[in-house]
Amino acid sequence: MSRKVAHNALWNVGGQLVSLGVGLVALPILLHALGAARLGVFTLALGLIGFSGLFDLGLSRALTQTVSSSLGQGRSRALVAALVWRVIGLLAGFGVLWLVALWWAAPFLVERLFSLGGEMARETLFGLRALALSIPFALAATGAMGTLEGLQQFRLLSLWRMPMSLLQFGLPVIVALIRPDIGWVIAALAATRVVWMALWLMQLQRLLPREPGIRASRDDLRHALHFGGWLSVSNLIGPLMVYADRFYLASLFPPATVAYYTVPFDTATRATSLPQTAMSALFPALAETQARPEASTRLLALAIRAVVVLVLPAVLVVAVFAHPLLAVWLNASFAGPATPVLQLLLIGIFLNSAAHLPYALLQAHGRSDLTAKLHLLELPVFAVLLIAGVHWFGITGAALAWTLRVALDAALLYLTAWWLQRPLRLMLAKGVGLLCLACAVFLLVVYALQGPLQLALTGVLVATCALAALHMLRLNRPGTHKEITP
């Protein structure tokens, strides 16, 4: 099973590599074509797309969990297919409701929240309404993708994500070079959602066709709606806590200033998204093995070590070389205010990568209610941290608030998983100790050291993580049956 998860993870990483490369090339072109202010609006539009987990009311994730667990228990594929297509129809219907809501709210967002006026306001309003029109298509696509993940078709997903990533960034770049109007650029981004839907529905019809005369079980539909209902709470609060900072900053500062925060944030998430993408292969595997604690233990032990040996060197290198990387990629004037923001966010991104593991474990066991309740607990804490941080430290304070919130989230998720999963307690405790050690090393290298000593220790740590990764690969070769523990 661990080899299968590793294989799926590698395909996920391959697809994400293409997306990362396209994004790194596209953002400087968009900055040159649109300017910092319009680029800030474009990143806000990307933030709205990030709320797709809210728009689908948790049903795409529910499909992943239901399909994985049902097929793992030997359920009929025809019954599973009937449920899947029923839920995708519901998603498209919900999308129409969200379309109307965003269309109606767009003027308020532009004038009150973003505080835009004149030509910029007109362009942004057009772009937001174009984005609204794409929501039903986007939600149907997320349902199909969630099902394909439940079928563990990660190779197929990655192969098609590669050209779609080129389209997602390439089309807005072409439009920006022809006509630097942010409205049309966002409209081009929205158009790619329609293509996504057509692609994924065709693939799903090929792999899991709906058979005439077979209807979805009411119990299965009720389970999916219950799971998705609680998950929608997390999907409301989770993206809100991820993206609320940029919208709060947009209400206080001009778009050019917000870009000093949003561009480092998007850069950091993309630069470290490869290991996180690999971790997404863990969720359906955990759902499939929920009745076998020993298999879940091996999967989680491997995943915790993978987070450390893959994510830690990535965030460490980017943090140490943050200023020169930003200066070369964008320009020196942009790198100055953006560097401390990027370094703080990287700590949070490492912790967030680690938090994905207990989050996936709890949801794979059907406990989306627990993750939702934890997010409800964190929301007021984050609101206080964000307001206080921005008041005292500006955009750097927003980065600090986000990182502190992520640290709290990780601590609560690991504690909850430890409390709920008795067979996994020892492994989880060892994993938390390893993660705390990794955080301490990051803080020491980035903030306490400088000059040749900082560079030397960074090199040693990266080499150590690389050797550890090779050791893990050796242990998971065919014919090797050693159990990996943190």
Residues covered by each model-derived region:
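N-terminal membrane topogenesis motif
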Residues: M1-G23, A78-G89, R122-T124, Q152, ...
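Interhelical loop/hinge segments that connect adjacent transmembrane helices in multipass membrane
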Residues: M1-V5, I182-G183, A198-V242, A281, ...
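Signature of the first transmembrane helix
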Residues: K4-S69, G95, L99, W103, ...
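Helix-loop junctions and terminal segments of transmembrane helices
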Residues: L57-Q73, E149-G150, L208-P209, P264, ...
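Interfacial segments at transmembrane-helix termini and the short loops linking adjacent helices
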Residues: A106-A130, A301, V318-F350
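Transmembrane alpha-helical segments of multi-pass transport proteins
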Residues: F126-R129, E378, M427-E483
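Hydrophobic alpha-helical transmembrane segments
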Residues: R129, S158-R206, F227, L376-F382, ...
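Membrane-interface junctions at transmembrane-helix termini in multi-pass inner-membrane proteins
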Residues: I135-R161, I178, G183, L204, ...
